[in-house]
Amino acid sequence: MKGILPKPTLLELDEYDINQRVIEALTTTCSHAVLFSIVNVEKDVVEIANELQISLSSTYKALTNLEKLSLVEIQRFKITDDGKKIKMYRSRIKKADISINENNSKVLLYPNNY
């Protein structure tokens, strides 16, 4: 008896492949800029948005996606004078190599040893 579900296509498989999601994050202009703006120093969302001249919502969206992929981490929390807790982000990678050939993609990530 054949399987009940049809065999997924290559595109359907890649859609959920972690490599594919990392490649998408690294090649999206906003995410790429956000990620590599916090390689050498930790920053909060406002600092990143101001430095890159992008909206806060785009910055939050990029950081949320990068954090889900474990490409950034919350380095620490900064407490403001009025008691607000601010997340300080740092990139977990300092470099990435992407290789794509035929039906195969490969991502090599280099850790950020800060």
For each feature predicted by the language model, list its residue ranges:
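Hydrophobic residues on short alpha-helical segments
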Residues: 23, 32-38
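Short, Lys/Arg-enriched N-terminal segment that forms or immediately precedes the first helix
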Residues: 4-24
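A short acidic, leucine-rich amphipathic alpha-helix
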Residues: 47-52, 66
